[in-house]
Amino acid sequence: MSRAFVLVMDSLGIGGAADAEKYGDAGADTLRHIAATRALDIPNLMRLGLGAAAHLSSGKALPGLPASGKISGAYGAAREKSLGKDTPSGHWEMAGVPVMTEWGYFPRTEPCFPATLTDALIARADLPGLLGNCHASGTEIIAKLGDAHVESGKPIVYTSADSVFQIAAHEESFGLARLLELCEIARELVDTYNVGRVIARPFDGPSGSYVRTGNRRDYSLPPPEPTLLDRFDGKTVSIG
């Protein structure tokens, strides 16, 4: 085989994992829940075996979609071995490197980040301070703290249930290049805490109408060992 395409529909689950409750995801079955609430027209995916894979995973047919039909692809349903539920864990495992050690997570406290981390980030990046320092929804926190950020120049830092350190900043007032440089510094600092990703969350727009832009960038820890893509030793083109 001279060329292969690996397509990932991230977060489109076809059945809940046995440990879903551990992560607050009991009852998760994303594709089934979507199919139960609206009509899906996905003939090509069904021919490739998506419906059959969903049935294999949960023992139930997808609502509103044919339970049988001609399948032109090979299909299967896998159960994740990795200890985490985040994006890098799943992607690495699909590439042959499951994550068998726990990621570092930040507590649901305010502040949620240790002072040694935030103090070092402020000093290294010459910042006037930080806003947020909590668990939050990305869209909600820019609506809440966006004005204070623009006025003060303090970036917004927050986390979630995943192993992430997220930094939001206004593309015009703070600058996209400066935000990305800040995230590179943060990536170095959070390595000590075994955090999976630092995520740049740029936003734009006027007060009251802040919107996240498409310039998000993820800074992930490298896989702990070579993936299948490394072992194939070929040219890799990544999109997305």
Language model regions located:
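Extended, H/D-rich, highly charged conserved domains that either
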Residues: 169-170, 176-240
